[in-house]
A protein has these predicted regions:
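Charge-dense, helix-prone N-terminal extensions
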Residues: 1-123
Length: 123
């Protein structure tokens, strides 16, 4: 869902009720585990940027919750773990068809790796 919300808090007020708790939890993890990143709205959704470059984001899409890990190194390092759990993946996108499919322990690992990495960002 592309939003015109100006803040992440406003964005979270617009999401479907059945996804809201999961998205709030994703936001809290991003805020806690991505020190030095700025929380902002870009591309119609919440984004966490470092040095003005978006590296992590999430969004409530029509058919899934998307977690966007735009660091190639981090995404590639966790791809096998996500595939083993049957999660749909794109180049820099993790697609959760239902909120209950989100393994927050794995998300935490990914976010910690993103915070520590300086790898190539997806174009």
């Amino acid at each position: 869902m592309q939003s015109s919300a100006q803040t992440v808090s406003d964005y979270l007020e617009e999401v479907p009720a059945e996804r809201k708790a999961a998205l709030i939890r994703l936001r809290n993890l991003c805020c806690d585990l991505l020190p030095g990143f700025e929380e902002t709205m870009m591309y119609g959704g919440p984004v966490y940027a470092r040095g003005g470059v978006a590296e992590v984001g999430f969004a409530s899409q029509k058919h899934f919750i998307g977690l966007y890990i735009l660091n190639n190194e981090v995404m590639d390092a966790h791809r096998h773990l996500l595939k083993a759990k049957g999660i749909s993946l794109g180049k820099g996108c993790i697609r959760y068809a239902r909120p209950e499919r989100i393994d927050f322990a794995v998300v935490e690992q990914i976010l910690k790796a993103a915070a520590q990495s300086n790898g190539q960002i997806c174009a």
